[in-house]
């Protein structure tokens, strides 16, 4: 099966406002000392044969999660994996997938247990995608994990002792979340974000919704102001990130103060395979 690369507009939709999704999330300032970007080339040539077809399928699902015939049944909003993991997860500063497979299995504080890469991917469907968890071992699950593993070629295997963070994770902003000013964030949103994401947060064209019924739910990582602010600082405005730490935090506080689906775990677990 050949991949169906998304247009730049679709990739641009990856505002980084949308969910946290797979293991390449932001880390704390303390953790950042041990997490440095690695100069490993991004793979471009697919493996031969059936394996390459699965990698291509995973890439297609990552770029078109909400509409792909295999994954759309598990998605409850209008977001795609690439809405947060820019450029199909290949942007090293935007919740990158690069090298992520090398950090698993790892202990996940949120789940209070050791999880695999597959577990981490599937949990994102429940939170960032406001959908249901695909079964372990399903075609969707295997394809996404295979794609991320392909993007991890060349990275040494080193299980993360700090949680589900890949080697290109960006450090959390060194700012007190309690200083967030949502009123100031509203002003900044109107001048900086509204042209792509709309005054109602529903997204414009191919740009993703950042609040409302089609955005991430309250259980997503980016529903936490500091995590969202870190993503905004590194990626927004798209193509020219220039926000100060405080402005990023204020925008995050405003966005997360708006209505969004409430996360109730039992409603998102799905069925076992």
Residue map of PLM features:
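Gly/Gly-Pro-rich "capping" loops immediately C-terminal to redox-active cysteine motifs
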Residues: 44, 70-118, 202-237
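Sequence/structural segment immediately N-terminal to covalent heme-attachment motifs in c-type
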Residues: 50-88, 165, 169-207, 225-228
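Acidic helix/loop microenvironments that form the catalytic cleft of cell-wall polysaccharide enzymes
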Residues: 82-85, 147-148, 250-259
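Repeat-solenoid scaffold signature
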Residues: 238-250, 257, 263
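A cross-kingdom marker for long, charged
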Residues: 259-273
